[in-house]
């Protein structure tokens, strides 16, 4: 790919991972051919290249589920368009439950999937072990099977998008570092690179784990931080079924997929760590991180119990690589406030392969139409306050997002990290009265008050939580007599 730069473009895309290549592909396919993508090193060399490649359609919201569903459609079509095989295998997926709470959550997810026309159905233990014969089913209550899920090759998929972008007229330049996004009068005017300046009407920050620092130069908050993420690949396993479904054991914190006659299994860590707290090395390209055995031993023991063949199979690859996680588990996707023409797509929480095609299309459609073409409000960059893009906060908060990936997704679940940052003058007085605090945009706000003899801690449920009656009593007291409500955090 050429590194010769043009002087002007309608759109400059920064970052050659799956997100940047997806935006370029969908803009060019939509008729916007005056598009140039700039990559500091080589395509996929940041975090895309080492992704596990899982493709699961059911995500945490309507928008992200729509992204993933579209992604599966594109995976089945893009080879015919570009000649590049994305390595998609529609093996299906199975998610298992080891307790009643998890089983209830999986059944709720299956109901949610059906709203999108995604096939999902319950499997009992006998059916699960028939499809996943290597599993120890002790303690498994059942699971959910999604036949249209699968996996893809991250590099091949990204290269397919890049090839499609070029076929439709976009330009891709590697080994070009963007040093600054240029602005004037509250809107972008272009970018300054180490090889010259490009004037542009729109700039898209798809910088992955570099996106935060790039955005900070222009006062654009991109609340993400790189965290260490492990996976292991076994030696070849005789007679391993090639059509083995992707397996997710949320309670064990593990996911599994067949990988060319081997098993790849990764972890949603119980004790996640931020990476590059002093900055990402300038030379970073296709790099891996040191593998620290103590960081994964707890989850590895659970993995060996769940799939006993690990106890007698060698490990070929011990891998640790950086993945970007956001402060609240949501993407940052959209136009930055007060910076007309500055768009961001980053912080996708290790879902880039399954969400990249759809997220890139959503942003490309927004740029071409001049407005969002679907509800993307949950990802709005305007939700981010300045302090939420600061390093100290993100280094504490973002690893919790990784930890919670496979935790129970309770309604109203409270984060435990980076708490107590913003308090009103009434904080201590209300705490003395039994306030159980919840956090909203950093503010500690009483969710309910515990009566004498009750500890003010949240419990969680898909039904009425244990503190429901206490909250009901407060509501009645305010309705029938009087109450004091602290609104000082609203300014």
Model-inferred region functions:
Residues 26-29, 53-55, 73, 77, ...:
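Active-site substrate-recognition segment that forms the wall
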Residues 28-49:
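Glycine-rich FAD pyrophosphate-binding loop
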Residues 53-131, 251-256, 262, 294, ...:
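Dinucleotide-binding Rossmann-like beta1-alpha1 core, especially the glycine-rich loop
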Residues 144-202:
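Helical element adjacent to the flavin cofactor pocket in flavoenzyme catalytic cores
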Residues 154, 251, 290-422:
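C-terminal catalytic lobe of FAD-dependent flavoproteins
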Residues 384-491:
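Glycine/proline-enriched, intrinsically flexible loops and inter-domain linkers
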């Amino acid at each position: 790919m050429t590194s010769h730069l043009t002087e002007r473009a309608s759109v400059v895309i920064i970052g050659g991972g799956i997100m940047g290549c997806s935006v370029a592909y969908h803009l060019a396919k939509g008729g916007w051919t005056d598009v140039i993508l700039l990559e500091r090193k080589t395509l996929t060399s940041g975090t895309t290249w080492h992704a596990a490649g899982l493709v699961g359609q059911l995500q945490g919201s309507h928008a992200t589920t729509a992204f993933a569903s579209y992604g599966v459609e594109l995976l089945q079509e893009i080879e015919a368009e570009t000649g590049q095989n994305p390595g998609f295998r529609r093996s299906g997926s199975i998610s298992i439950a080891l307790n009643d709470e998890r089983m209830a959550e999986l059944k709720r997810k299956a109901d949610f999937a059906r709203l999108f026309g995604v096939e999902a159905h319950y499997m009992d233990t006998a059916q699960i072990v028939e499809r996943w014969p290597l599993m120890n089913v002790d303690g498994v209550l059942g699971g959910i099977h999604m036949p249209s899920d699968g996996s893809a090759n991250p590099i091949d998929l990204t290269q397919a998008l890049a090839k499609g972008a070029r076929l439709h007229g976009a330009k891709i330049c590697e080994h070009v570092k963007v040093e600054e996004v240029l602005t004037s009068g509250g809107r972008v005017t272009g970018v300054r690179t180490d090889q010259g300046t490009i004037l542009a009407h729109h700039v898209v920050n798809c910088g992955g784990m570099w996106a935060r620092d790039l955005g900070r130069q222009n006062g654009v908050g991109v609340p993400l931080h790189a965290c260490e993420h492990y996976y292991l690949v076994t030696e070849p396993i005789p007679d391993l079924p090639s059509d083995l479904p992707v397996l997710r054991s949320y309670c064990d914190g593990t996911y599994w997929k067949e990988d060319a006659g081997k098993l790849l299994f990764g972890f949603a860590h119980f004790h996640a760590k931020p990476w590059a707290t002093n900055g990402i090395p300038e030379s970073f390209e296709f790099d891996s991180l040191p593998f620290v055995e103590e960081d994964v031993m707890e989850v590895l023991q659970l993995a060996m119990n769940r799939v006993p063949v690990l106890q007698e199979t060698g490990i070929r690859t011990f891998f640790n690589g950086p993945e970007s996680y956001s402060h609240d588990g949501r993407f940052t996707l959209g136009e930055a406030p007060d910076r007309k023409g500055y768009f961001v797509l980053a912080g996708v929480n290790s879902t880039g392969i399954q969400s990249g095609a759809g997220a890139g299309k959503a942003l490309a459609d927004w740029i071409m139409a001049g407005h969002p073409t679907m509800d993307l409000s949950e990802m709005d960059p305007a939700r981010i306050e300045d302090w939420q893009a600061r390093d100290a906060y993100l280094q504490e908060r973002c690893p919790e997002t990784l930890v919670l990936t496979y935790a129970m997704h309770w309604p109203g679940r409270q984060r435990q990290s980076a708490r107590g940052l913003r308090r009103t003058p009434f904080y201590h007085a209300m705490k003395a009265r039994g306030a159980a605090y919840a956090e909203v945009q950093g503010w500690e706000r009483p969710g309910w008050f515990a009566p004498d003899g009750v500890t003010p801690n949240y419990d969680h449920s898909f039904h009425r939580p244990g503190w429901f009656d206490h909250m009901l009593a407060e509501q009645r007291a305010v309705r029938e007599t009087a109450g004091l409500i602290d609104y000082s955090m609203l300014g």
